[in-house]
């Protein structure tokens, strides 16, 4: 990721680490659930889903800023660039690592069907994607008995 010339390394590293944590939350917990009766959004904020805490993010990030690049072509203040939002997508690496773990479990269980797994990779979605015997016994149909619908649905 190109951030131009760093004006303050500590701030830039903090921005990268913070954006990673935000991206991790985005790709693992910020799930959109809707009320089936009204179509209104149920998960309207962090009161309805878990945001990453200090125990959920890596203790050791190992962020390095490379120096010595020619930034003379940049026509910005002190040849710098914004660093706050670009690293947000680094959090997707967590999603893909979890997806690889699920694929390994599915191979172990003898499941050869293709895996369709969308973000966010919530614990529930990860567990259901494993397709083992316990998951098969716990499946809840989209339409319940007597034509009733679940409280919230995933679209």
Give names to the regions the model predicted.
Residues 1-155:
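Cofactor-binding beta-sheet edge motifs in enzyme active sites
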